[in-house]
Amino acid sequence: MHQQQISIIGGTYVEHCTLPQWYETYGSGSRAVSTLLALGCKVDFYSYLSVESEAILNARAYAHPDQLNIYVTPIEQSVVFDYLYPLGIPSIPKFSIDVTPIHVNKDSYNFLVFGMLEADAIIHGNKVVYDPQHPDAPKFFYENGS
């Protein structure tokens, strides 16, 4: 059987919730990766990752041999989302990250692209599904040259 291939570009963030209490590393990009790996898809994942977040993703990939390729743009510290409860509006501490946009040009690939806090991703692909992840001022996909 042929494995479906998809590229995901998205955030990997630390999520802290008070009630119920949890402290996990996910974010929209990493959550999508976990879901698609569980469905048997082969995934190329592009994200801004701290050393700690990269180690967590590599541990998750261990359960799915040959399904996940991780392309890291390194950052010093992960962004943290603090929630009082799971459906609450998160508090995101101020942060300053000076990074360049992630560039991916794979015209034969399908992409799932999430807006990220660190920087935009510039994507050229066959089919692209884009979720800007911004409730107040979402950017159009083409605004950054994608």
Task: Report the location of each language-model feature.
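Conserved beta-strand positions in the Rossmann-like core of class I SAM-dependent methyltransferases
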Residues: 44
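Ribokinase/PfkB-type carbohydrate-kinase core domain
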Residues: 2-13, 24-25, 47-53, 58-146
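Histidine-anchored nucleotide/phosphate-binding helix
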Residues: 27-38
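Short, electropositive, low-hydrophobicity segments enriched in small/polar residues
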Residues: 14-15, 31
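A short, glycine/small-residue-rich beta-strand->loop->alpha-helix junction that serves as a flexible
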Residues: 17-28
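Short phosphate-binding/catalytic loops that engage adenosine nucleotides
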Residues: 41
